[in-house]
């Protein structure tokens, strides 16, 4: 296409008044015929391809600029939000000044101590006045100071909607509070403004109400003994952040500046430590042996039963279980930390240590209470491990990525669940890998990729399964075999959809099935034979392919028979004759030389030669697909194909009156009976491994079908 013609066509299509219907009408009137329309169609198509390439090039060139612009917009939005936050913070500080006067008036001399919690700017006073000391009591003041703390907490929480029940908790007081900004944990996008109230035993998170000044709405309440605090490394513009881990969720908050962030981290850790010390002392007091009751003589109490003495002995033994060791007291909290930090091995090691320590020991109430706390952590740990093996997690790590979670579930006694989750995870991975394969190019190329992806994944899964579940219940291996059968069904669905549903040729289908069988045999390296499964799943599709190709051969043979003139073949050139000899030799006809004459003539009919090549080609491709379940299908298809040819020869021989043509027909019949049929029979026996009686009967019969000599039509 010339440049001038292309530019003229482009200008015409780009014009504002262009109408496709009018343009096509004028083009049809001006064209001389089909050739002009085809040429114009090619020009339009070339212009469309050129436009598409230019569009792709422009998109690629502007892509980087688009990304940079989006990033700058995000940064600008963040800075504007920070500015709005600072202005609102200043406004809130001014509005909260009256609240600072309430605890000051109530506390009297300790006014400076009790002004804590009045707003974001007095966090230092809150920390100094209300943070518990090492002994679990306030650092300064008692009596009036305690009442001031409670009144300050009550005053602040009255500004939070939906937390009336919290005000009734005895002994609870405010430690620290301040404004924060919450971010999405996955995409690091700003979610909302919140206000945190840290009490001596919990953390209250409330969302800011923009319509009502200085008011908040209750959002969440987290006990400190189930809360883990993690510092988030600064990554500008995302800075001054820390993360709170509460199974099964996590939340990220941003402080106003680095100083306030440090205060939050310090006060959270110190408050958690004080709460842990307090509860440990309570457990030690509960587990401490009680003073024995005064012993009275038997004589002074003649009604005392001897059973009381027997019952006292087990009780004394039960009280001998020592739970005062530091690692036992801190075990629930250590388990929470391990779960939050994803230290699954450490958590299971702690559980094993506890179980070993309490083995063969009685279970008094303190032990049962400890067991209840530990069981709750075990449940949480199990849920985390189950989530690690869920298909929602990333599947790119392969089977080895699941080993950590599977091994810990097995150590927790969850072998069956670990097996189920592992196989479900791998099924999702195999399904995703198959779905992500691009269907492009030749079918055989796609099948090579499909087999490589599927059988490699299956082999890796089997090896990892054998590693993870070695020494476990044999029922797990049965589950793996069932899973492998299901995965093979998934593979066959994708295989059949591309090979058989798309109506590929029999030769292509045979090559694809051969590739699949070769890959399937590789599983024998690990003692897994799934060949019978792939045969069972493919037998229906292969039967359909054989039947379809058989019908094609029969229709083609009948069409050639209808045009049969019973004349010798003239190949015109020695090269064509040599090529035909090679083709017949590859079909197994070794004595074809005796049917060739001088000057490139062949003493056989074109119909018989074409039938021979087509039948032998069908047999060779069918043998590539063969397995025992297809024996009768293949044999019956061959018999039907051969019957069409021999019936036509038999009918022509009975009806032909010309002696010369009749002799030529006999020569073709002799070629069919004495050369072609023995070759078919021998090749079938080589491929299958046993002879076929039906083919022997066809060869030995002098007439395959008796036809009325007076009839002029052949009914097949």
UniProtKB/Swiss-Prot annotation:
Keywords: Cell projection, Cytoplasm, Exocytosis, Phosphoprotein, Protein transport, Transport. Residues 129-150, 275-319 are annotated as: Disordered. InterPro entries: Cullin_repeat-like_dom_sf, Exo84, Exo84_C, Exo84_C_1, Exo84_C_2, PH-like_dom_sf, PH_domain. Residues 303-319 have a biased composition (Acidic residues). PROSITE patterns: PH_DOMAIN. The keyword Transport applies. It comes from the Eukaryota. The modification Phosphothreonine is found at residue 313. It is found in: Cytoplasm; Cytoplasm, Perinuclear region; Cell projection, Growth cone; Cell projection. GO terms for molecular function: phosphatidylinositol binding; small GTPase binding. One of its GO terms (cellular component) is perinuclear region of cytoplasm. Residues 275-284 have a biased composition (Basic and acidic residues). The modification Phosphoserine is found at residue 15. One of its GO terms (biological process) is exocytosis. It holds the Pfam family VPS51_Exo84_N. Component of the exocyst complex involved in the docking of exocytic vesicles with fusion sites on the plasma membrane. The exocyst complex is composed of EXOC1, EXOC2, EXOC3, EXOC4, EXOC5, EXOC6, EXOC7 and EXOC8. Interacts (via PH domain) with GTP-bound RALA and RALB. Interacts with SH3BP1; required for the localization of both SH3BP1 and the exocyst to the leading edge of migrating cells. Belongs to the EXO84 family. This is Exocyst complex component 8.
